[in-house]
Amino acid sequence: MTELTINHTLDTLGLRCPEPVMLTRKTIRNMADGEVLLIIADDPATTRDIPSFCQFMDHQLLKSQTDTKPYQYWVKKGLDHL
């Protein structure tokens, strides 16, 4: 598998819902389309909230690791329409 280029990292360890999603939204708002954000979290609610956020806000959840803590999510700003 090709290694993902990470442009930004957001550490939300210790934060609980809704803070991880609020910080994700704030961070992505300041990113350029196509950039990738790595989100690191330990709140079990993020396993539901981050994928839902991506779908609702039209971002791509490229990859996630939710088997063990800390959870990791790779989110690309915007959607590829090719």
Swiss-Prot record:
Keywords: Cytoplasm. InterPro entries: Sulphur_carrier_TusA (IPR022931), TusA-like (IPR001455), TusA-like_sf (IPR036868). The active site is at 17 (cysteine persulfide intermediate). Gene3D superfamilies: TusA-like domain. GO terms for molecular function: sulfur carrier activity. PROSITE patterns: UPF0033. GO terms for biological process: tRNA wobble position uridine thiolation. It is found in: Cytoplasm. GO terms for cellular component: cytoplasm. Belongs to the sulfur carrier protein TusA family. Sulfur carrier protein which probably makes part of a sulfur-relay system. This is Sulfur carrier protein TusA.
